[in-house]
Amino acid sequence: MHSPPKPEDVRELTPTDVNELEGFDGIMFGVSARYGGIPAQMKTIMDANGGLWQNGKLVGKTAGVFQSTGTMQGGQESVAMNCMSFFAHQGMVFISLGYIDPKAFSYEEIHGGSPWGSGTYAGSDG
């Protein structure tokens, strides 16, 4: 869908980087949908947080989600809800955007997003 490349100063989190999460006040997770659920890469990062969980290092930190799906009804809300279990187990505080933009109630054009988080449609080719 002709999206621009990722800016150089935006880092991608890998399972070996998860201990860095401890140093942040809040974390926004950008998650794509795979058949209505979170992709394996995101699940791997979540599963790598055992040490942080065991020591309560993410307790009280704020968390949010923005998501991308290939199509309408592609799982934007279910992706956000799938992240809730991780946030709850870590003791994180989920911050929702709610319906802050009046465009959420407009049906004149196709757009993503929900009270669970900001969203977009990437098309079937990602």
Model features per residue range: what roles?
Residues 1-57:
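N-terminal beta1-alpha1-beta2 submodule of the flavodoxin-like/Rossmannoid cofactor-binding fold
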Residues 9-13, 98-126:
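Glycine-rich phosphate/pyrophosphate-binding loop and the adjoining helix
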Residues 30, 68, 124-126:
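Short amphipathic alpha-helical segments at helix-loop
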